Design a protein with these regions (language model features):
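Repeated scaffold domains used in trafficking and secretory/extracellular systems
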Residues: 2-4, 46-51, 89-98, 138-147, ...
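Beta-strand-rich domains and repeat architectures in extracellular enzymes and scaffolds
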Residues: 1-18
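Blade-loop segments of beta-propeller domains
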Residues: 21, 30-57, 64
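Residue-level detector of Asp-centered blade-edge/turn motifs that repeat once per structural unit
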Residues: 7-9, 53-57, 97-100, 151-153, ...
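Loop-centered beta-sheet repeat module
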Residues: 116, 120-174
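Short loop/turn segments that connect beta-strands within beta-propeller blades
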Residues: 26-28, 73-77, 119-123, 170-173, ...
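Conserved blade-ending motifs and adjacent loop-strand segments that build the rim/top face
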Residues: 177-208, 243-267
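Asp-box/WD-like beta-propeller blade repeats and closely related beta-sheet repeat scaffolds
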Residues: 47-48, 64-114, 127-138
Length: 289
C-alpha cells in the first residue's frame, strides 16, 4: 500500500511500503526514478517505515525502525552516515528533526512514553512524553497511519489520531492548538480494553462508528487546516478556516470523490489515491473560498 507521501522540490515522493522503496514522480505524474536501498549492506535497510527531507541538513533521512536513521544526499543516491537509535527505544516508527542535532522520535512498541527527544551528537535522550497503551497502536485503528508530525509556520505539529487534536511541540512539551468538539460524538480511549485485533475490527464498525475518530490524513497552511476522519462507517472531511474560525464538515465533493488529503501547501490540497483510477488531484486554495 501507499505509505508516506511528500512533495519536495517540485517532485512527489511516495513510499511503496510492500516493495520498501520510494517512488519519485514529476509534477505531471510522470515516473522519474526510485530510491531503493533495501539490503543488508552498509547504508541499506531491511525495513523502511518513513522518510523525511531534513531542512537543517538538506539531506534525505530514511528511517529503518530497528536499524536507525540512514542519511543520504537530497537525491537519495549517496550514503552519508547512519544515526543509531537510543538503546532504550526498541524501534522507531516515525520521526522529525527539531534542529540539526535533535530528533523527535515516535515508537509504537516502547513501554510507557512513546515520544523521545534524542540528541544524536550526545547520543542522549533529552526528554520523553506521551504515554499510551501499546495495544492502542497495535490492535486498534485509533492511531496514525502516516507520520503524526508536520511543519507549519516553522513549528513542529503533532496530530493525536484517535480524536484529531492538534498540538505544537515547544520546549519539549505538547501545546494544544486545535480541539474538535463533536459533542456526544467525541471519542475517548479511557474505556478501551486490551483486546485482540479481531475484537477491534468489530468494535470499529459498531460501537466505534458512533463517534468521530481515526483521523488519518491532515495538513495545514496559512489559511486552512484540513483533516479526514471516520464516523458512521464513512469518511468525512473537516476544513477549518483560520480566518473566519469556522469549520466545514462534508462527506464528499459534489463530483463524488472523497477528500482525503495527502499533503497541503500554500497552493492547495494534494489528494493521492492508491486506486489507479483516482490518481493525483490538486484542490487549489482559491477553490476553498
Amino acid at each position: 500500500y501507499v505509505g508516506e507521501r511528500i512533495y519536495h522540490d517540485s517532485k512527489y515522493y511516495i513510499l511503496d511500503t510492500p516493495q520498501k522503496k520510494i517512488l519519485v514522480f514529476d509534477e505531471n505524474g510522470n515516473f522519474l526514478y526510485d530510491i531503493n536501498k533495501h539490503g543488508n549492506g552498509p547504508g541499506e535497510y531491511t525495513e523502511l517505515y518513513s522518510f523525511y527531507f531534513n531542512p537543517f541538513t538538506g539531506d534525505l533521512d530514511l528511517l529503518s525502525p530497528m536499524g536507525g536513521i540512514l542519511r543520504y544526499d537530497s537525491l537519495g543516491q549517496n550514503f552519508k552516515e547512519k544515526i543509531p537509535l537510543p538503546l532504550t527505544v526498541p524501534a522507531v516508527h516515525q520521526f522529525i528533526a527539531l534542529d540539526k542535532d535533535t530528533y523527535l522520535l515516535f515508537s509504537d512498541s516502547r513501554e510507557g512514553n512513546k515520544m523521545v527527544v534524542y540528541n544524536i551528537v550526545q547520543r542522549k535522550i533529552i526528554s520523553e512524553l506521551y504515554d499510551l497503551p501499546k495495544f492502542l497502536l497495535f490492535n486498534t485503528f485509533y492511531h496514525h497511519t502516516y507520520s503524526p508530525f508536520y511543519i507549519c509556520e516553522g513549528k513542529v505539529h503533532f496530530v493525536q489520531s484517535y480524536n484529531g487534536d492538534v498540538f505544537t511541540f515547544e520546549n519539549n512539551s505538547l501545546i494544544p492548538k486545535y480541539h474538535w468538539d463533536f459533542g456526544e460524538q467525541n471519542f475517548e480511549i479511557s474505556d478501551l480494553k486490551d483486546e485482540p485485533m479481531e475484537y477491534y475490527f468489530k468494535y470499529a464498525r459498531t460501537v466505534g462508528a458512533k463517534y468521530a475518530n481515526i483521523f488519518v490524513s491532515y495538513g495545514e497552511n496559512s489559511r486552512y487546516y484540513i483533516t479526514d476522519f471516520a464516523y458512521d462507517n464513512k469518511y468525512w472531511t473537516l476544513i477549518y478556516d483560520k480566518q473566519s474560525k469556522e469549520p466545514v464538515v462534508f462527506n464528499a465533493f459534489k463530483e463524488g470523490h472523497e477528500c482525503i488529503p495527502s499533503f497541503v501547501d500554500e497552493s492547495g490540497v494534494y489528494l493521492i489515491g492508491a486506486d489507479p483510477n483516482y490518481g493525483l488531484n490538486i484542490l487549489n486554495a482559491e477553490d476553498l473560498d
